Amino acid sequence: MTKKRVQQLVAIVCSGAMMLSAACALNRKAPALPTYDKQDFVFFGFWSPYDFTEESYALYRQSGLNTMLFTNHSVQTASSDNLHYLGSGATMRSLELCRKTGLNAILNYGWWYYEWVEGGKSYGDTPFSDYNLYEDYKDMIVGVHIADEPKYNQIDDYAKESLIADYKRVYDVPYMLNLYPSYAGQDAIGYEGYKQYVQTYADKVLTQFDDNRLLSVDFYPFRASSSSMHSAWLACYNNVASVAKSTGSKQSYYIQTAVGNEFQGELGQDEICMQLNVAMAFGADWFGFYCYEMPRTYLEDGTYEPMYSYCMLNPDGTPSPLYYAVQSEIARVSAFSDAYLAYDWVKTVPVTPAGAKENYALKLISGSDFSGTSIEQVTAGSDTVVGCFTSEKGEAFMVVNYGTPSEKKTSTTTVRFGRDGYAAVYGKSGAPEIVKLKKGELQLEMASGEGRFVTLL
């Protein structure tokens, strides 16, 4: 056989092999969705129900909230029966009602409630041991709320080694202090900047716990002073997420569900959707909703004024439109909690549309890029944030359209990966989609505030 004939045969064989390979690639069956261990988000409302009835607690549960934080101080006359603190009648009644309605519970330390009711009397040095009354409910207690928004010079009060040692003798759940947002004044967060405020709390409090570490913040982005989102929102979350990552802490973010007063005059499902998605772009594990019940200001004549126009409930205690918006959005994100919670947050990267002026909010977190990930490039028709995650299963990304929800603009975000294959896309209503990457690219159509959680298969 001549050399030329051999070369022709080799060419034919190689060509056939290539065609067969290409055909197999075209006909390759899409992979199945991976399976994940069952995990749930924690959803709770701040300002718990006024009425200690099974009907009231069932209404709370039907909203999608699965945990009750025992705190509510809108009372005309303070008593053990209407304030939640260690040893109060209200705490025991709420635990019993939570048991009946399928809710988990976050106890309230409530030292100042106790002093209010007891005429200035102190808990003493070992409050958790002295009021260790809830052993029968330990299976449903997922945390203890210690304080809301401690100032920088109050952190030491909650970081006392003797207090935390007493706590650890009784409880093996998060010791919860909800921190100020970054827009608080220097009298609240100190003069060294917001990240130092968060880091100081982590160094003084969280490091005393080997596990069950939780960082919580309440940043409400839809302020009355603006028709859009507060420009420091992303930077605040980035600071909290970075400290949480370095300390191995879970993260809890409050979702704004109050309208009027210091907040914008209208909120709807689009704003709830966006807040959940943005928090998830930074690795959220827990979500609080402020407010569930309406805070009240009591007047001298015994009447009261509502603090807001409406919350999840109206001033008369009936469900508002936000109740149903929260219900729908909790169902949406809960549908992929197993997948999302299987991954750990690494960083969040901002993306500005080509030729557009950089949004100041995105500029504040502009130090991150996609190095170290499978993403080569992201192009977007709207401001976008991309949370980058990893686990033993691989990489995942939370892609969020950071456009103002009220503008209701839809745009395309194109994510180009360094390889072909498939991706699972979660976050729309309904079942997740398995999408074949076209030339390594994934296109996502999202309205302002919408997000998609993407895992590479």
List each language-model region with its residue ranges.
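Gram-positive cell-envelope targeting signals
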Residues: 1-29
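Glycan-processing catalytic domains of CAZymes
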Residues: 27-422, 427-457
